[in-house]
Swiss-Prot record:
Its cofactor is Mg(2+). One of its GO terms (molecular function) is magnesium ion binding. Mg(2+) 2 binds at residues 173, 175, 236. The keyword Ribonucleoprotein does not apply. Its EC number is 3.1.-.-. This is Flap endonuclease 1. Belongs to the XPG/RAD2 endonuclease family. FEN1 subfamily. SUPFAM superfamilies: 5' to 3' exonuclease, C-terminal subdomain, PIN domain-like. Keywords: DNA damage, DNA repair, DNA replication, Endonuclease, Exonuclease, Hydrolase, Magnesium, Metal-binding, Nuclease.
Length: 340
């Protein structure tokens, strides 16, 4: 579901180039889901290799990471660990949404409505066995580090910004702000030209950055209070939120009363919400321990052998992407040498 803080946080447009030389901790599952949902054929079906295995995520990781490295960006991918018990309701909700979308997809295909078919196909997106291993394999070949979080990937990505190991975390979800990320970048892995569903129109999706401290100052809230605002709206750990409370009402209530326990109108509902545990998930997430981030060299031959030889990618397209990366890195190296 993700947290609906869009109307409240302070967002500023930015450019990918502004992250050159900076480490960005990417919510891996969030990025991979985006690739799986958007990189599809005209009928809405995902790309596959000769054995029928999905390759949409690998295509996204190839082109996006080649672009990142070409610009001098240092991506680090953070994979989810075991989900908190409180997330089970949200996981079940997502499962039901996908089942319903699958039925609608089949009906749209039968009716010959390919726009609807593609829309519903995207809603069926799920992470299947092997996709995480596939993703880690291509990251290794690029020399890009990845981290297995003990629980929520966004929490560990936020932790990396707190320790100074990363400049920002990257995710479409606003949960990173509640987890304490110093900076959150949205549209980081899906920026560019995108088609508007059911319309023959395209938009340019631009990255945007959210400074958590600026957001807290603008809203006149502590981080603890912002977590309470999130709980009122609804998080992955209480997806229904509170009845008839949206972002602006939640902010007003916390301003007036300070904390959940002191808001009169929600007391009947509050007893059925594990709000103390949800607070702890955001404010005291499980520690990832000592993390060492090491970047390696790109294995151009290894990427080609894996994607072309094992996953049925076009040799010409892979070569073109890697050649662009090689030329960009050579140019950056030459420019750097001029300073010495």
């Amino acid at each position: 579901m993700g947290l609906d803080l869009k109307a409240l946080v302070s967002r500023e447009p930015t450019r990918l180039e502004s992250f050159a030389t900076k480490v960005v901790a990417i919510d891996a599952y969030n990025a991979i889901y985006q690739f799986l949902a958007t990189i599809r054929g005209p009928d809405g079906m995902q790309l596959t290799d000769a054995r029928g295995r999905v390759t949409s995520h690998l295509s996204g990781l190839l082109y996006r990471n080649a672009s990142f490295l070409s610009m001098g960006i240092k991506p680090v991918y953070v994979f989810d660990g075991r989900p908190p018990t409180l997330k089970s309701a949200e996981i079940e909700r997502r499962r039901n949404v996908k089942k319903g979308a699958a039925v609608k997809y089949a009906a749209a295909v039968d009716a010959g409505n390919m726009d609807d078919a593609r829309k519903y196909a995207q809603q069926t997106t799920s992470m299947r066995d092997g996709m995480v291993d596939d993703s880690k394999q291509i990251l290794k070949l690029f020399g890009i580090p990845y981290i297995d979080a003990p629980s929520e990937g966004e929490a560990t990505a936020a932790y990396l910004t707190q320790t100074g190991d990363a400049y920002a975390s990257a995710s479409q979800d606003f949960d990173s702000v509640l987890f304490g990320a110093k900076r959150l970048v949205r549209n980081f892995t899906n920026s560019g030209r995108r088609k508007i569903p059911n319309r023959n129109m395209y938009v340019d999706v631009q990255p945007e950055i959210i400074e958590t401290e600026k957001t807290l100052t603008t809203l006149d809230l502590t981080r603890e209070q912002l977590v309470d605002v999130g709980i009122l709206i609804g998080t992955d750990f209480n997806p229904d939120g509170f009845e008839r409370i949206g972002p602006k009402t939640a902010l007003k209530l916390v301003h007036e009363h300070g904390r959940l326990e002191d808001i009169p109108r929600i007391q009947d509902e509050l007893g059925s919400v594990s709000y103390a545990e949800i607070r702890k998930i955001f404010l005291e997430p499980e520690s990832p321990g000592n993390i060492e981030i090491e970047f390696g060299a790109t294995d151009y031959d290894g990427i080609t052998k894996y994607l072309v030889g094992e996953r049925s990618f076009s040799e010409d397209r892979v070569a073109a992407a890697l050649n662009r990366l090689r030329r960009a890195l050579e140019k950056r190296s030459q420019n750097l040498d001029q300073w010495f």
